[in-house]
Amino acid sequence: MTKGIKKILYLAVTGLIMAAPLNAAVNNELICIDPGHQIRGNSGLEEVAPGSSVKKLKVSSGTRGVATKKYEYQLTLEVGLKLRDALQNKGYKVFMVRETNDVDISNKERAIKTNNAGCTLYIRLHADGINNSSTQGTSVLTSSPKNPYTKSVQKSSDKFSHDILSEYVKATGAKNRGVSYRDDLTGTNWSKVTNTLIEFGFMSNPEEDRKMSTPEYQTKMVNGMVNGIEKYLREK
């Protein structure tokens, strides 16, 4: 064997060894995606948090686009499946809370499913609606430092929320409506996993509603979320 061939083989093997930890790190991350809502709401009640006497509706069907007439549960699944594909193409393992619209999974059950799956990150996909057609923009929701139910993941969830928001805004150009600290969200309170809830935009705004249903904009939405996930994982 010539010295040249030996050198090429050495460099190739060294490169593989050096690359292995990076690929292993990616492959060890399980990302959980929860496309919000479902085709039929469930008006039954469930505890808003473990041991809480406060109860809320299990799950609703969400809002509806004023221009597209598309339901929120349709939009979130549409984008969620594209996010799944994008992450899998990068080597991540993905757990989908739902892959069809005709399901009956409460917000508490969604969180428990992701806890049991052993997820690294849990992202909940939603879209906003309000009685003001001019309001637009994106926001993320997470728990506050004073929330007694989320102490183990509050700080990491706060950072994850900021990372998702900043990268989503950068990719889409959407108006940044900031981080909203909420302690009344069932899915957040039951989660033992670093998590965030993103509101893509307002389906009550005709322009934003139409935009969120275009393939081009959905690609930007997905790219932003992937970038946010990878930013968090790099820096955690």
Go through each PLM region and give its residues.
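Catalytic-site microenvironment of enzymes
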Residues: 1-236
